[in-house]
Regions:
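Short, surface-exposed coil-to-beta transition loops
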Residues: 101-103
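Conserved positions in beta-strands of structured domains
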Residues: 13, 105-108
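Mixed-charge, low-complexity intrinsically disordered regions
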Residues: 1-99, 112-116, 124-209
Length: 209
């Protein structure tokens, strides 16, 4: 059996500081903005020359927060309520033999300075500090397949949770938005996805998250 070693090329800077509440797929929270910081020796402007002409990117990354748990031959996909089991290769589960993930994100801007290359991203679904091992431009002609079938995940999950704020919180958000634009929208979109475990959906647990 062959083994391979890969170098980290960058790190994600994201509003998600922990796994809880991170969208289960990219694009579900469109106001989730973040950055990919390339690290030496890959933080060269030449390495991203022409990338600004693409609207979206594939990011290949490492599931660094779950890799110690090892892989599992079957998992419980959230889309099936967290109860039915599927083979790990029929899911996007983090518990894989090789803990590699892929995320399709919006490329908003490429910023190059003397010693840094930063990609500004939108529709992000990655936790802060995620190690990145590769990036590739998204090619619509080859990768957009409208006739494809996707079993239990044919369409995006509905954002069903109603989200409201008290008057006091709304006042605080107005102040915070001066520093964090779109913060209110971001919170609404995250909570509307109901980030609780799939088997808790629809329950009134009374818990505070």
């Amino acid at each position: 059996m062959s083994s391979f070693q890969f170098e980290q090329i960058g790190v994600i800077r994201s509003p998600y500081k922990e796994k809880f509440a991170v969208p289960r797929q990219p694009g579900l929270v469109k106001s989730a903005n973040g950055e990919l910081h390339l690290i030496a020796p890959y933080n060269q402007a030449d390495a991203v020359r022409g990338l600004e002409a693409f609207s979206h990117l594939w990011i290949l990354f490492v599931f660094h927060q779950t890799m110690e748990g090892g892989w599992r031959p079957t998992v419980r996909p959230p889309r099936l309520g967290g109860n039915a089991r599927m083979g790990v290769f029929a899911t996007r589960s983090t518990f894989r033999p090789n803990p590699i993930g892929m995320s399709l994100v919006e490329l908003k801007e490429v910023v190059c300075h003397k010693d840094s290359v930063i990609l500004k991203l939108g529709s992000l679904d990655l936790v802060d500090g995620t190690p990145v091992v590769d990036i590739k431009p998204y090619l619509p002609f080859a990768e957009s397949l409208p006739d494809a079938s996707a079993s239990y995940a044919q369409s995006a999950p509905a954002a069903e949770m109603a989200v409201s704020f008290t008057a006091e919180v709304e006042k605080q958000l107005l102040t915070l938005e001066k520093r964090y634009p779109q913060l209110t929208l971001f919170i609404r979109e995250v909570l509307a996805q109901d980030p609780r475990p799939a088997y808790r959906k629809g329950e009134e647990t009374g818990k505070t998250y």
